[in-house]
Amino acid sequence: MMWQRAQGLREINDSQQEGGLLLCADALETDLSAYLGQVQMIYLDLPGATGQDYSCKLRVGEKGWETSRQAINLPAYSDYVKPDDQQYLHDLRRMLDLSHALLTDSGSLFLHVEANTLARARLLMDEVFGENNFKNQIIWTYQAGGRSKKHFSRKHDVILFYAKSTAHFFDITQVPVTRKEERSNHLKRHVDEHGRSYRSIKTGGKEYIYYDDEPVYPDDVWADVALLQQKDPQRTGYPGQKPQALMDRMLLSTTKPGDLVADLACGSGSLLMSAANNQRHFLGIDKSPVAFAVSRKRLAPYRLVCQAPFSDHGAMLDASSVPGIGYYTVGINSYIVPEEDLVGFETQPKGLPIRGLDLVDQWCAGLMNKGVFVAYASSVRQKQTPVLQTQLEVPLLRGTVSILLIDVLGRRTLWTATPVM
């Protein structure tokens, strides 16, 4: 049976695991007044100033997720033209002003910047947050990347860390790191009366003792967090994705369980995942429909409120809904997209035909009530689950059985078998 389109105000992903709010919107054009002074930590990794366009390499179908040999490139975002671009500086200043207003008095901001924008970003941060609230210029160094003969190869990123005020909350004991063994080479080793091993050194008339079992904490050079490798299960294909370990260190040191954190250009949703995994609430915003789709997929196991426009295109969905004992069994049979919709997209391999349910990246089944779609079950394609489930169960509750589907082009549609009253 062919289903028809429906419209909704928002989507709620029903789950027992606490999550947060995900918006497909421009943070600078969104009313966030309800969150003023409520956010404990903000992470920003904004478009840079290289003049480049970036695409998301999304795997397609069961074979694509199993072997990575089938994919489609989707436009993700574009950088500003150059570092002194007035639009870049204007938008960065507005984003910093918004972040300052959203933060609690004890809150923190981490701004991820590139080498060619660092100086200007630091000056703007000093203007908005105050020089006295500067905490660290964190160097995240890594070994991956290319080599250059025109200059020293760039092997680090910079993260500017600022507090909102002197009431700043910071707890480094939440982020211990592995002790560096090479530090002990020039120290004498001992064992105390309790059997604890330690090393010592005398200098300046004083003896310094370091117990082997004492925790150690990171400084402002982070060399122990690697870039995501090509086969890392975290990898989504979204450009610029950062590893969870990087997000965890910033989040755990500046927030407590139950706090609200935000990413106003959330991209692949790494900070949001860190928040959900560590019992923090999150607010994620990105104006890219592709970023929204990638983040939504990663956050599918968590309770999630989504607000994003629905696409209006010529696709058709063949689906079914069969009532049973306590549940509807909802199934998708086929999804048809006009061939012209796929024209112009680069695929791997070149000319890859994408048809049928290979066009579906994720879908969920649920009930519609008064414009609100509540998803009770979902299936998403990812490395761990390359095969799309074609049947899901929805409880026999009040509401109209509906399907929310996101295809491989990042287009989000809502469907129902009967008109929504």
Where are these regions (language model features)?
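Conserved SAM-binding loop and adjacent beta-strand
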Residues: 232-246
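Conserved SAM-binding loop
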Residues: 110-111, 264, 284
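SAM-dependent methyltransferase catalytic-core segment centered on the flexible catalytic loop
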Residues: 31, 37-108, 172-201, 277
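Conserved class I S-adenosyl-L-methionine
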Residues: 258-265
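Accessory, often C-terminal, charged low-complexity segments
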Residues: 1-10, 19, 28, 36-40, ...
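Glycine-rich SAM-binding Motif I of class I
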Residues: 269-273
